[in-house]
Amino acid sequence: MTALSEQARAKVNLTLRVVGRRVDGYHDLESVVAFADCADRLTLHPGAELSLVMSGPGAQDCGDTSDNLVLKATRLLAERVPNLRTGGFVLDKHLPVAAGIGGGSADAAAALRLLARANELSADDPRVVEAARLTGADVPVCLPSKPCVMTGVGENLSPLQLPRLPAVMVNPRVPVATKDVFAALGLRAGQLNVGVVDLLKSTGWPTDGSSAADWIAAVKRGTNDLEAPALKVESVVGDVLRALAALPGVRLSRMSGSGATCFALFANDDDAQAGAQLLKAAQPGWWVHAGALS
């Protein structure tokens, strides 16, 4: 069988509400999720031996490959699919790590899609979906990599029709551990982060066919509840947010996930590209991407 390849697109949390912490210690979330046009690329060379080789500009940041989520997802699927055909993976790493954009989760989801193709399985086969869920909280949403409202601990996905949103994404190349941000949030097991009245309110999102302006206005009404605790963990997040907010033509700036990646939305591609150029000149050490979310 010839080699198979998949993109592993960056995940962006346009909004992220922490509803509360469950008695089992996990956090219940509600998030509007989009996907960017920047990505890692994962290639599978089908064969008898499972392996993973790293390449690309971000390879040195990934550390030991033995506990990489690509291999974890593969092993979990192999436990559920007899005689699963695997092989050698090559990960061309471009997205920053520990960055709040689901890079490792997107890679794992890409691995599951590749394995599904190599074994003539549907990507929504229950065994594939279960392997995604057990690999990590962000892997289920990255499996289809389509805009949605994500709830629970990441397992409940409600599709959205999201227009193309011109955007700039910035990471200061400072890793932020998700567990540290949730620790800074400081919720006890069983504690709600929102009031009961707010919990009962259903957030209304624009209907299918709504414009980018409608969506930006709706997203503005939301928040990222992890922004404040992330600032306690790593103050450079504030520098990134201020730099994005100061760009000409910016409509919204916010942190994605648990950080440190932040994004800004614009009315058009020209403003986004111009903003990215300004940031690259002012902060040559930062990772900056201009493109679109969808």
Swiss-Prot record:
Transmembrane segments: none annotated. The active site is at K11, D138. GO terms for molecular function: 4-(cytidine 5'-diphospho)-2-C-methyl-D-erythritol kinase activity; ATP binding. It comes from the Bacteria. Pfam families: GHMP_kinases_C, GHMP_kinases_N. Pathway: Isoprenoid biosynthesis; isopentenyl diphosphate biosynthesis via DXP pathway; isopentenyl diphosphate from 1-deoxy-D-xylulose 5-phosphate: step 3/6. ATP binds at P96, V97, A98, A99, G100, I101, G102, G103, G104, S105, A106. It is an enzyme of class 2 (transferase). Gene3D superfamilies: 3.30.230.10, GHMP kinase, C-terminal domain (3.30.70.890). Coiled coil: none annotated. Keywords: ATP-binding, Isoprene biosynthesis, Kinase, Nucleotide-binding, Transferase. The keyword Heme does not apply. Its EC number is 2.7.1.148. It catalyses: 4-CDP-2-C-methyl-D-erythritol + ATP = 4-CDP-2-C-methyl-D-erythritol 2-phosphate + ADP + H(+). One of its GO terms (biological process) is terpenoid biosynthetic process. Catalyzes the phosphorylation of the position 2 hydroxy group of 4-diphosphocytidyl-2C-methyl-D-erythritol. PANTHER family: 4-DIPHOSPHOCYTIDYL-2-C-METHYL-D-ERYTHRITOL KINASE, CHLOROPLASTIC. Belongs to the GHMP kinase family. IspE subfamily. NCBIfam families: ispE, PRK14608.1. This is 4-diphosphocytidyl-2-C-methyl-D-erythritol kinase. It comes from Rhodopseudomonas palustris (strain BisB5). The lineage of its organism: Bacteria, Pseudomonadati, Pseudomonadota, Alphaproteobacteria, Hyphomicrobiales. The gene is ispE.
